[in-house]
Swiss-Prot record:
Belongs to the 4Fe4S bacterial-type ferredoxin family. RnfC subfamily. Its EC number is 7.-.-.-. Part of a membrane-bound complex that couples electron transfer with translocation of ions across the membrane. Keywords: 4Fe-4S, Cell inner membrane, Cell membrane, Electron transport, Iron, Iron-sulfur, Membrane, Metal-binding, Repeat, Translocase, Transport. This is Ion-translocating oxidoreductase complex subunit C. The gene is rnfC. It comes from Klebsiella pneumoniae (strain 342). [4Fe-4S] cluster 2 binds at residues 387, 416, 419, 422.
Length: 753
C-alpha cells in the first residue's frame, strides 16, 4: 500500500485557483527549427539587463573587444555583461532600452568587425570535481541570469538557497500565448538542457528534481523523455495547459502542493526554480566556457512573413530581427516584447535585445482587434475569479486609482504577478495591470524616499552622538588638565585678597579735613594755566605772523627755550636740596612777609634786567633772550630758596596765615613779573627771531604751577594737634574763596598785560 501511495504521489499534480484559457497561437512559430540571424553592424548592450545594480565599466571608447569579453565587473547582484561579438567600442552613452517606461539607460555601443572572434574559452567538463562555490562564481561571472522573464542573477539565487533546497524545479511550462522559445529549445537542445540540470543538481544537492511542462508541447516532451531515460533523480511532470501555470508560485503549487507564503520566497519552503533556457546557459558557461552572449527569441505575429525562433545576439536592434523575419511595417507599427498578456509595447524599433527578451510579437490590425473604450467597473467579480494569486483586483483597482497606497499594500498588491488574467476577463475593458504596475512603482518610490530619509536621520543622529562624545572627551581632557594652584601661588592669592580688604577698610574710614589747610589743587591750576598760556601763545603767534623778520641771524628760540627749561630744572633741584637743611631748628617767620619779600626780589631782578637792556640798545649787537631768561630763572630760584629757608618750624604755635591775602599778593607779584618780562623782551625784536610762544607759555605755566605748589607746601603749618578743634568746613570754604580770588587776580593781571 505504501509503495502504491508513493507511486501515485510521484506522478500527482495539483491545481491552483483561477486561471484562464486564452487562444494559444503557438503553431505560428514552433514548427521550424532554430536558426541563426545575420550579425548586425552595430550592437547596443545595456549595462543593466537584470534585477539589481549595473556593473562597473571595464572598457572605454576606442577599445577593441572580442566576443565573450567582459564589458563590466559585477559583485553581489551586479551582474556583468559581455561583448556579443568582436569589434570596437564606439560610444558609451544612454540609449532607450527594453522597458515599459521607455527610459534611456547607459549602454555600450560596439561596431562589429564581422570576424566574430571569441576570447579564449576554458570549459570545465569535469565540473563534478569543482567546488560548489567555484561553480556558482563561474556562473555569476559569465553573466547568467534568469531567462524566463524575471532576470534575477542566477549565481545570487543559487548562493542564497543552496543549504535548504529540497526540491529543484525546472520550469518548462511556457504558458503564455504566441511564445515558443523554450518549446523549440527543448526540441533542438534537450541534451544540453539536461546537462545544465545536472550541474544545478550537483550544486544544490536536492532530494528531487522536477521538470514541469504543459501538455501542449508533445515534441518537447518526447525529446526530454528520450534524454532522461537513463537519468536518475530527474522526473518529468506533464501538467494541464492553463494560464498562468508557468508562474513560479503557481508551478510550485502544481508540482508540490505547497504554497509560497505571503511576502516570502519559494526557498522558504525548500523549493528553487530555474528556467530551461537558464539551464542551457549554465551548461554553456560551465562546460563550454562561453559567457551569455545570445539567447533564443520568438519572432511571431501576422505582421511577419517568416515567423519562428532565432538565435539573437544580445544588443541586436529589434528592427534587425524583424527585418530578418520579413516584417511588414504599417503606418503605425506596433511591436510587443513578450506575450500579449504580460508583454509591453516597445517605444521604438531601435530597442536592443536583452537577456529577458523571449518574444517579439508583431500583430496585424485584425489580429489585435480594435481598441476598446474603458468603462466603469460593474463589480462583477470576474477578475477575482480569474486571479491565480487569490487577490481582489477590483479593490486594488479602486485603491490604485484613488492613490490609497496603504490600503493597496494591505490588500497584498505585492503578490500580484501581473499575469493579465484579470484584464483579459474584464467586461469593462479596464487595463487593470497598468494600474497595478503604476501603483507598485509609486509605492516603491515612496519606500525609497522613506529609506533615504531614515538613512539621513541615522546619519544625523550618528553625527550628533559623535559630537556629544567629542564634547565629553574635550571636557574630560580639560578636567584632567586643570591642576590645583601651588603653595606660592596660593600665598600670592591670599596677599592680593588681603590688599583688597585693606583698601576696602581704608575707603570706609571718614575723611577729616584739617583746619587751616588748603587742598592741593596744583594740577587743576596747572591745567588752567596751560590752557590760558596756549590761548596767549596762539594770539602771539597770530600777531607774529603779520610781522616780517628782517634778519636771519637771531638766536634759535627752541634752543633758548630748552636751555631755560634746563636752568629752571636745576634751580628747582637746588631748592629741593637746600630746603630741609635747617628746617627743624629755624625760627618761625611770617609766611606773608616772606612771600612779599620774595616777590619784591623777583621784581627787582626784572627791573635790573630792564635797566640793563636799554643801555645796550643802541649797540648793533642783539640781546641774547636765552641769557636773559636764564638770569631771570636764577633770580626766581634764589628767591624761592630764600622762602624755603625761612619756612615755619614752630607751626603749632604760629598764628594761622590768611591764605586769601597771601594768594592775592603772590598773584600780583607774578603778574608784575610777567609784565616786566614782556617789556624787556621786545628790545631787539626787529633783529631777533621770535621764540615759539606756545612752548614758552606752556613751560612758564608749568613753572608757575610748581612754584605755587611749593609756596603752598611751605605756607601750610603742621596743625595735626589742633585739627580736632577746628571746623573742617570753614577751612574748605576759605580755601575755595582763596582759589577764586587768586584766579580773579591772575585774570586781572593778564588783562593789564
Amino acid at each position: 500500500m505504501f509503495k502504491l501511495f508513493s507511486a501515485f504521489r510521484k506522478d500527482k499534480v495539483w491545481d491552483f485557483n483561477g486561471g484562464i484559457h486564452p487562444p494559444e497561437m503557438k503553431t505560428q512559430s514552433n514548427g521550424t527549427p532554430l536558426r541563426q540571424v545575420s550579425l548586425p553592424q552595430r550592437l547596443i548592450i545595456p549595462l543593466k539587463q537584470h534585477i539589481g545594480a549595473e556593473g562597473e565599466l571595464c572598457v572605454k571608447v576606442g577599445d577593441r573587444v572580442l566576443r565573450g569579453q567582459p564589458l563590466t565587473r559585477g559583485w553581489g547582484r551586479m551582474l556583468p555583461v559581455h561583448a556579443p561579438t568582436s569589434g570596437t567600442v564606439t560610444a558609451i552613452a544612454p540609449h532607450t532600452t527594453a522597458h515599459p517606461s521607455g527610459l534611456a539607460e547607459m549602454s555600450v555601443i560596439i561596431d562589429a568587425d564581422g570576424e566574430d572572434r571569441w576570447i579564449e574559452r576554458d570549459g570545465w567538463s569535469d565540473y563534478q570535481l569543482r567546488t560548489r562555490e567555484a561553480l556558482i562564481e563561474r556562473i555569476h561571472q559569465f553573466g547568467v541570469a534568469g531567462l524566463g522573464g524575471a532576470g534575477f542573477p542566477t549565481g545570487s539565487k543559487l548562493r542564497g538557497g543552496s543549504d535548504k533546497i529540497k526540491t529543484l524545479i525546472i520550469n518548462a511550462a511556457e504558458c503564455e500565448p504566441y511564445i515558443t522559445a523554450d518549446d523549440r529549445l527543448m526540441q533542438d537542445c534537450a541534451a544540453q538542457i539536461v546537462d545544465g540540470i545536472r550541474i544545478l543538481a550537483h550544486i544544490l544537492q536536492p532530494d528531487e528534481v522536477l521538470i514541469g511542462i504543459e501538455d501542449n508541447k508533445p515534441q518537447a516532451i518526447s525529446m526530454l523523455r528520450a534524454v532522461l531515460c537513463d537519468a536518475h533523480g530527474i522526473s518529468l511532470r506533464v501538467i494541464p495547459t492553463k494560464y498562468p501555470s508557468g508562474g513560479a508560485k503557481q508551478l510550485t503549487q502544481i508540482l508540490t502542493g505547497k504554497q509560497v507564503p505571503h511576502g516570502g520566497r519559494s526557498s522558504d519552503i525548500g523549493v528553487l526554480m530555474q528556467n530551461v533556457g537558464t539551464a542551457y546557459a549554465i551548461k554553456r558557461a560551465v562546460i563550454d566556457g562561453e559567457p551569455l552572449t545570445e539567447r533564443v527569441v520568438t519572432l511571431t505575429g501576422e505582421a511577419v512573413s517568416r515567423p519562428g525562433n532565432v538565435w539573437a545576439r544580445l544588443g541586436t536592434p529589434v528592427r534587425h530581427l524583424l527585418n530578418d523575419a520579413g516584417f511588414c511595417a504599417s503606418a503605425e507599427p506596433m511591436v510587443i516584447m513578450g506575450g500579449p498578456l504580460m508583454g509591453f509595447t516597445l517605444p521604438g524599433l531601435d530597442v536592443p535585445v536583452v537577456k529577458i527578451t523571449n518574444c517579439l510579437l508583431a500583430p496585424s490590425a485584425s489580429e489585435m482587434g480594435e481598441p476598446q473604450e474603458e468603462k466603469g467597473c460593474i463589480r462583477c467579480s470576474a477578475c477575482a475569479d480569474a486571479c491565480p494569486a487569490d487577490l481582489l483586483p477590483q479593490q486594488l483597482y479602486w485603491f490604485s486609482k484613488g492613490q490609497q497606497h496603504d490600503k493597496a499594500t494591505a490588500h497584498n498588491l505585492a503578490d500580484c504577478i501581473e499575469c493579465g488574467a484579470c484584464a483579459w476577463v474584464c467586461p469593462s475593458n479596464i487595463p487593470l495591470v497598468q494600474y497595478f504596475r503604476q501603483e507598485k512603482a509609486e509605492i516603491s518610490a515612496i519606500r525609497q524616499e522613506e529609506q533615504r530619509a531614515a538613512e539621513a536621520k541615522a546619519r544625523f543622529e550618528a553625527r550628533q552622538a559623535r559630537l556629544e562624545r567629542e564634547k565629553a572627551a574635550r571636557a574630560e581632557r580639560h578636567k584632567k588638565a586643570a591642576v590645583q594652584p601651588a603653595a606660592k601661588d596660593q600665598d600670592a592669592i591670599n596677599a592680593a585678597l588681603a590688599r583688597v580688604r585693606d583698601k576696602q577698610r581704608d575707603a570706609a574710614q571718614p575723611i577729616v579735613i584739617q583746619s587751616g589747610a588748603k587742598p592741593d589743587n596744583s594740577e587743576a591750576i596747572a591745567a588752567r594755566e596751560a590752557r590760558k598760556a596756549e590761548a596767549r601763545a596762539r594770539k602771539a603767534q597770530q600777531q607774529a605772523a603779520s610781522v616780517e623778520t628782517p634778519s636771519t641771524d637771531a638766536a634759535d628760540p627752541r634752543k633758548a627755550a630748552v636751555e631755560a627749561a634746563i636752568a629752571r630744572a636745576k634751580a628747582r633741584k637746588a631748592e629741593q636740596q637746600a630746603a630741609p637743611v635747617e628746617a627743624p631748628v629755624a625760627e618761625p617767620v611770617d609766611p606773608r612777609k616772606a612771600a612779599v619779600e620774595a616777590a619784591i626780589a623777583r621784581a627787582k631782578a626784572r627791573k635790573a634786567e630792564q635797566q640793563v637792556a636799554p643801555v645796550e640798545a643802541p649797540v648793533a649787537e642783539p640781546v641774547d633772550p636765552r641769557k636773559a631768561a636764564v638770569e631771570a630763572a636764577i633770580a626766581r630760584a634764589k628767591a624761592r630758596k630764600a622762602e624755603q629757608q625761612v619756612a615755619p618750624v614752630e607751626a603749632p604755635v604760629a598764628e594761622p596765615v590768611d591764605p586769601r591775602k597771601a594768594a592775592v599778593e603772590a598773584a600780583i607779584a607774578r603778574a608784575k613779573a610777567r609784565k616786566a618780562e614782556q617789556q624787556a623782551a621786545p628790545v631787539e625784536a626787529p633783529v631777533a627771531e621770535p621764540v615759539d610762544p606756545r612752548k614758552a607759555a606752556v613751560e612758564a605755566a608749568i613753572a608757575r604751577a610748581k612754584a605755587r605748589k611749593a609756596e603752598q607746601q611751605a605756607a601750610q603749618p603742621d596743625l595735626a594737634s589742633a585739627a580736632a578743634n577746628d571746623d573742617p568746613r570753614k577751612a574748605a570754604v576759605a580755601a575755595a574763596i582763596a582759589r577764586v580770588q587768586a584766579r580773579k587776580a591772575t585774570q586781572q593781571a593778564v588783562n593789564e598785560e
